Amino acid sequence: MVLNAPILKSNEQQVLNQKSQKLSSFAPRHIGPNSDDIQQMLKVLGFPSLDALIDKTVPQTIRLKQPLKLPEAESEYAALASLKKIAAKNQVFRSYIGMGYYDTITPLVIGRNILENPGWYTAYTPYQPEIAQGRLEALLNFQTLIIDLTGLEIANASLLDEATAAAEAMSLSYGVSKNQANAYFVSHDCHPQTIDVLQTRAKPLGINIIVGDHQTFDFDRAIFGAVLQYPASDGTIYDYRAFIEKAHAKGALVTVAADPLSLTLLTPPGEFGADIAVGSTQRFGIPLGFGGPHAAYFATKEEYKRLVPGRIVGVSKDAQGKPALRLALQTREQHIRREKATSNICTAQVLLAVMASMYAVYHGPDGLKQIAENIHQLTLMLAAGLKHLGYKISSEHFFDTLRVELGTRSLEVILEACQARNINLRIFDDTAVGISVDETTTADDLIELFEIFAAPDSLLFGFKEIGDLIAARRKSSLQNSTFARTSNYLTHPVFNRYHSETELLRYLHKLESKDLSLTTSMIPLGSCTMKLNATAEMIPVTWEEFGKIHPFAPASQTQGYQILFQQLEAWLAEITGFAGISLQPNAGSQGEYAGLLVIRQYHENRGEAHRNVCLIPTSAHGTNPASAVMCGMKVVAVACDSQGNIDVDDLKAKAEKHSHELAALMVTYPSTHGVFEEPIQEICAVVHSHGGQVYMDGANMNAQVGICRPGDIGADVCHLNLHKTFCIPHGGGGPGMGPIGVASHLVPFLPGHPVVTINDSTQHSHIGAVAAAPWGSASILVISWMYIAMMGADGLTQATKVAILNANYIAKKLESYYPVLYQGKNGLVAHECILDLRSLKKSAAIEIDDVAKRLMDYGFHAPTVSWPVGGTIMVEPTESESKQELDRFCDALIAIRQEIAEIEVGKVDAQDNVLKNAPHTAESLITGEWQHPYSREQAAYPAPWTREYKFWPAVGRIDAAFGDRNFVCSCLPMDAYSS
């Protein structure tokens, strides 16, 4: 046998390689319809090919002339291997940096059954509460946790990060202030990233930030509010009572940014007079993740309930009178109040809030207190030992963090010793370092720290000696101080029942089974892009090389992350046609805000700070005007024509009228009505001719990738919802990521950061930080990296084409039953379509909600209801749904239309019918005498597929008005559920 002879002929080898590549290709796994399905769907639409469909859908003037320049697509396994090599370049050090970020232990039962479970992470925001009771209960637990720990009356269902929560608290304080002040006091003991985000948020609103010492602030100057850190960033615990009393006497509200774990030992903010409490629940089992995602919290007094940002879960009742949960007080949210909204927050951090709540459920009040006491005792030990070694500890009272004055010791020597042992400390200055103890710290870690801080000629000591020192310093223990907590917390049974893994596992499964996620069926929400979140994309999120990195770790330890960011930024720049990308905004709402701030800073830098008018089409999503107002801009509405397109004549008139003051136009493309507007380039040119900039909302980017690019169309800024187009899961309402792309002239103004240099070119003119962490929720960026790496240019482009195909297929199949409200000039839609149900109210007294709830009986989540047009539903199938699933969904809507027809002709009672009584629970079918004029079978099994697998709504239709009139946002007593 000749060893170097080819085993296969070259052509045979090529064929085998091609077959192997086809088998391992990710794109066909991601895209639902196969080639045969695509041809059948095209036949229904009357097109010979996908390209022919796209040619008639997307204006030729904006089409890409050449394919995207991206790396060749890799298989799932090859991409994971490539990312693993990048991850290996990160160095996982033991970080004692603190500053709001701490290592923690994620209970494995929570990691496996929530974080890694698509039943939890693929769900959408619970706007259809009857099929989201599990998530809503977990979030109610979260709110109860926060209410109990902070000692305040109400809490929301999470915010993006602690710094953003503090900024939202400032906005609330400003909104309710009656003393006409425009100054806000910020303690210099707050975390630096919080101070910077507050300064960023304050500037466009004309708020003057006063950073100072709360102990010496004399209140001669009027302030509308203040924020204090508890414990302080350097670990000190202050008695804030006197300051708060003085602030209240001057009509100011006081916010306390508090570590929730410390509140198991410390007097809660609500008990010493705080009006608002904010903070991060990261140390409740959420990995560091180089900055996120983590769930922040926001608690306040009930009198401010209609001003609270984000979402609040409230208790109501269903049609059978049983307790049921829903999102409460929705009329205060940005999608309804628009420019009058007090916040633009939309997506928050639901998945992480669920994890944090279950961490508290699993450990219970005693377990949480034990964790906190262990941390505190180790910190006391550390302080005693360092004092024994001759160091000064700055604080008399502390929880987990020490500021260590080095005295004559060299900082450089200390840091060299730390480097040798893979340890990070916080560096205050040349004379002091910070050490924060956390849940993972052990006695062995303390020995290592003592060895680092011991002088070469000093003698180390045993733990008995440290114990003696601690015994002599018992007064420093929080339990023996005036700061000790005396009130009970987490007394509800949910926090005292599920402490074994068996019990928690079953509880998690019970909640998960109440929720409809992508594991059940398609979620056809328009403008939400509920596409596949592939397992290969999700796996790297849990790798320690990404999860155990502190956001303020030295750059030398984060080379893997830097490569990831550079590659992802380059890919997104190519996809969008922009010169620069910022990955910092940690939600779409924050991307909008950051993009508009960049435009504002650009005008200001050119001496045109007077430009403050933002033109926004009347069809825009509510976050657009809310974001514009937050940036200090005046919103001027631009009319839309009868086809839902921007009225170009009205745009020209408004641009002309406000030419001197014009700052920007906010435009969504394709439009919020699901159409590629033909004159988009003319629209951009009009704005530019009057000195304005064009901000493109990237919510509908799933219809652009590989076909056209915002930068080529004429946009100057565009935010990208990575949790839509680029496969980060919605998590039931977060996490999300909203990076922005900008044209070259705007690159210098991209967000900066006070702790970490993120772009040298922007440090002098940047807008400041818009999120607490330098790269936002950095650890989930691996998901989008994996998606692009596995799809490649061809796969991404094909996905866009199929998304457009799927939407048009649905529109075509349903147009005979429900009018398609808006279409392009060739009778086609983009990636979503609006079905008009308004006539049904007159013909059959059927409301939009009746159809939405009836879809649950068919096993589907409703499309987006009554937006962007009241009385309509907007359907976005995405490219991931198969033809079979699309057909099932269409069949469900057709069957519902036939049910409505029976009402219209008088065959069925107009009030007692399958729609008005939907959704039907299993309990409603078997309890008591059946008194409806239709059968149980019609109610529960209206379609063949429901017999194969039936998803049961957990509750009947919920009484929304009752819940708002009787506002309760914490756990009900257990007897309420049995009554």
UniProtKB/Swiss-Prot annotation:
Transmembrane segments: none annotated. GO terms for molecular function: glycine binding; glycine dehydrogenase (decarboxylating) activity; pyridoxal phosphate binding. The keyword Transferase does not apply. Gene3D superfamilies: Aspartate Aminotransferase, domain 1, Type I PLP-dependent aspartate aminotransferase-like (Major domain). InterPro entries: GcvP, GDC-P_C, GDC-P_N, GDC_P, PyrdxlP-dep_Trfase, PyrdxlP-dep_Trfase_major, PyrdxlP-dep_Trfase_small. Keywords: Oxidoreductase, Pyridoxal phosphate. It holds the Pfam family GDC-P. One of its GO terms (cellular component) is cytosol. Its EC number is 1.4.4.2. It catalyses: N(6)-[(R)-lipoyl]-L-lysyl-[glycine-cleavage complex H protein] + glycine + H(+) = N(6)-[(R)-S(8)-aminomethyldihydrolipoyl]-L-lysyl-[glycine-cleavage complex H protein] + CO2. The modification N6-(pyridoxal phosphate)lysine is found at K724. Its cofactor is pyridoxal 5'-phosphate. GO terms for biological process: glycine decarboxylation via glycine cleavage system. SUPFAM superfamilies: PLP-dependent transferases. The glycine cleavage system catalyzes the degradation of glycine. The P protein binds the alpha-amino group of glycine through its pyridoxal phosphate cofactor; CO(2) is released and the remaining methylamine moiety is then transferred to the lipoamide cofactor of the H protein. The glycine cleavage system is composed of four proteins: P, T, L and H. Belongs to the GcvP family. This is Glycine dehydrogenase (decarboxylating). The lineage of its organism: Bacteria, Bacillati, Cyanobacteriota, Cyanophyceae, Nostocales. The gene is gcvP.
